[in-house]
A protein has these predicted regions:
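Absolute protein N-terminus
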Residues: 1-3, 18
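Sec-dependent N-terminal signal peptides
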Residues: 3-13
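Beta-strand-enriched cores of mature, soluble protein domains
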Residues: 17-150
């Protein structure tokens, strides 16, 4: 009977996940965007940024670059799709997609998906994490939170 309790305990312990928090920020330059505006007020904007800095709950930190688009309509609803590449202080890399649809260009929430990785980030491939992003003037703040199996 004791063996059964031990097996049950370890099964539950192994199935538990821990929170992983990723925070990034940067400055957006108008030089980093291309814009097409339609007569009805719809906009299609392509952004590229090479100056993002980040840190995470594991004690890692680094830089990232992202390229993507924002499509808005006359109601200022936004459809956003970005692809990002980041590297930590040890040179380990990760690649993500960040997709959201929201009621505001100024911020909102979406899903970050890890699509490739080297080193410690290989184990994160396929993990989807909800994120939030907020803009103020030329500054951007971004956070995503994942559940990682230990």
């Amino acid at each position: 009977m004791n063996i059964l309790y031990l097996i049950l305990f370890f099964s539950i312990s192994l199935g538990q996940a821990k929170d992983y928090l990723f925070e990034a920020g940067g400055i957006i330059s108008n030089a980093d965007e291309e814009l097409i505006e339609y007569p009805d007020g719809t906009k299609f904007i392509v952004y590229k940024g090479n100056n993002g800095a980040w840190k995470d709950s594991e004690g890692d930190y680094g830089k990232e670059k992202c390229i993507g688009y924002v499509k808005t309509n006359i109601n200022k609803n936004a459809e956003v799709h970005f692809r990002c590449e980041g590297a930590n202080q040890n040179g380990e890399k990760f690649w993500t997609t960040r997709i959201r649809k929201s009621d505001s260009v100024k911020g909102g929430g979406g899903i970050n998906t890890y699509v490739a990785g080297t080193g410690k980030y290989k184990k994160m491939i396929g993990i989807k994490c909800p994120y939030g992003v907020q803009y103020h003037e030329d500054a951007v703040w971004y956070t995503h939170k994942c559940k990682l199996n230990e």
